[in-house]
Amino acid sequence: MGRGARVPSEAPGAGVERRWLGAALVALCLLPALVLLARLGAPAVPAWSAAQGDVAALGLSAVPPTRVPGPLAPRRRRYTLTPARLRWDHFNLTYRILSFPRNLLSPRETRRALAAAFRMWSDVSPFSFREVAPEQPSDLRIGFYPINHTDCLVSALHHCFDGPTGELAHAFFPPHGGIHFDDSEYWVLGPTRYSWKKGVWLTDLVHVAAHEIGHALGLMHSQHGRALMHLNATLRGWKALSQDELWGLHRLYGCLDRLFVCASWARRGFCDARRRLMKRLCPSSCDFCYEFPFPTVATTPPPPRTKTRLVPEGRNVTFRCGQKILHKKGKVYWYKDQEPLEFSYPGYLALGEAHLSIIANAVNEGTYTCVVRRQQRVLTTYSWRVRVRG
């Protein structure tokens, strides 16, 4: 994840990048942006767990605050799922912290920040998260790493970090579970802001961690401007989970009630009287799961022909599109099985301006299509069907 508007190499789950930052931030022309960033941010969602045995402690007379916005008017889908809809097969996830940041934050503060980020998701979903010792097995593995870390030098689709003021973090889609933070950054508890004294950006760990956790759960970037999973969430400062993320989780994991008393509460009229609480705990009983009509997948012109490629498992495959017509100022759009591909996903595929590279495996099997458009006119279309040979 990063602060810039650049398309990221989303970790095998994802990451956001900031490219417009650098050493020249002392320029006075950036003062308005710095003042804006200094005002961004909000405290993390308070811890609150609704276990089956804690019903009496919920205190329905006082509705706990929630970050979920009210109902929205019907609109088009803005969240994005992974092309293969990768997801976890259980909701009780464990995580371990393999390394801590070397700048500013202590291990204790780091644990507090990560716990707050996990609560943002557990408070609005069936997921629960529990930290385990570093030597124990876990679903999620979190670490703060230097530029060259793990297998980034030998993996074609897992990129290395780029030092300060570049990529902040990246995460891997399920079931990999890796969440990597750039140890060159200056992580803090509190809003992202620029430090004139240190001459560096101080980055809100809770905010970035919550974004990367969304990727680790299977969500890609949202097109909703105020979504936590938006590409520029760090720059814009939106720290609350939007309805977009909840709809994405519902489509990926199903719309589930979190308490066994939800049906009873719904019959007593709590769906209207305690709408926010019920939307968080009892979306199925109150029929809050899908409040707008889900569209069909993005339409793509049928390619005149589709080439089938049988590829050995593990091989890197590259498709090239529109090389001869780029001078006509056309824009290239990529699709997998008719679902639009907007970003790179390290560990799965790398998306360039006019080329697409994938690692041949069971997840990446399917039909890839590129469409070159100039405004509303389609200039050309190519399609490849990939089958993996074991």
UniProtKB/Swiss-Prot annotation:
GO term, biological process aspect, one: proteolysis
EC number, as in UniProt: 3.4.24.-
Cofactor note: Binds 1 zinc ion per subunit.
Residue ranges that the UniProt entry lists as topological domain Lumenal: 41-390
Disulfide bonds: 255-289, 262-282, 271-286, 321-370
Regions that span the bilayer: 20-40
Gene that produces this protein: MMP23B
Tissue-specific expression: Predominantly expressed in ovary, testis and prostate.
Stretches assigned to the ShKT domain: 255-289
Bilayer topology: Single-pass type II membrane protein
A molecular function GO annotation: zinc ion binding
SMART domains documented for this protein: IG (SM00409), ShKT (SM00254), ZnMc (SM00235)
Organism: Homo sapiens
Protein name: Matrix metalloproteinase-23
Glycosylated residues in this chain: 92, 148, 232, 316
Ranges of residues in domain Ig-like C2-type: 295-380
InterPro entries for this protein: Ig-like_dom, Ig-like_dom_sf, Ig-like_fold, Ig_sub, M10A_MMP, MetalloPept_cat_dom_sf, Pept_M10_metallopeptidase, Pept_M10A
Primary localisation category: endoplasmic reticulum
Residues at the site labelled Cleavage: 78-79
